[in-house]
Amino acid sequence: TPDLLPADITGSYFYDPEKNKFKFRKGPIFCNILLADEINRAPPKTQAALLEAMQEKQITIEGTTHKLAAPFIVLATQNPIEYEGTYPLPEAQMDRFLIKLSVGYPDEDVETGILEGRSQRKKDTFSVKPRATPDKVVEMHDSIEEVFVKKEVMKYIVDLVQSTRRDPRVAVGSSPRGSLGLFKLSRALAVLSGR
């Protein structure tokens, strides 16, 4: 929301009169998966609070660094920029998201399926069962690091990223984070494909 402050996400220090000192109260960023719903409704200063967390897996508040949980993943939804009350995401922040998907509207069959699925539930709530522990996700992430990538694949990744910097149809080409992201994605795909 437009009135969301950085401290609402990161947490803040508060004075404890009983102990006569300041204590840190963790914000919702201290989690494994942070869902930033409609991220571009948050003001730029609040969006900026995510930059260090997304890159360094830590946050610094009043000179004190706080490590975030492992794994730490940010998923975000975004409204079209032309919607009233939205702010553009800065390039530095967009650069930290590995993947961007444009969902769009479902076709007639898919939308009918959504309604059929909803009609089978009696309430608007449903339960979600965990599929993996945070430790298992870290283990899977670490297994990706063991995947060998041929030089030809690395060259293809670099060529692809470099082409985004030369193409006049691309407003802002990919940064080196794009190469690193494609490198990581190719390794993950190899693991998922059983290679």
Each model region followed by its residue ranges:
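C-terminal helical "lid" subdomain and adjoining coupling/linker elements of P-loop NTPases
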Residues: F148, T164-R195
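Walker B catalytic acidic pair
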Residues: D37-E38, A49
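Canonical AAA+ ATPase core
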Residues: D16-K21, A42, M54-E146, R187-L192
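AAA+/P-loop NTPase substrate/partner-engagement loops
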Residues: T1-E18
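Amphipathic, well-packed alpha-helical segments that form the structural scaffold of globular domains
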Residues: V158-Q162
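Beta-to-alpha transition at the N-cap of a short helix in the ABC ATPase nucleotide-binding domain
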Residues: P6, T46-Q47
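Conserved alpha-helical scaffold flanking the Walker A/P-loop in AAA+ ATPase domains
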Residues: Y15-L35
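Residue-level signature of catalytic and energy-coupling elements of molecular machines
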Residues: I9, L50, F97, I157, ...
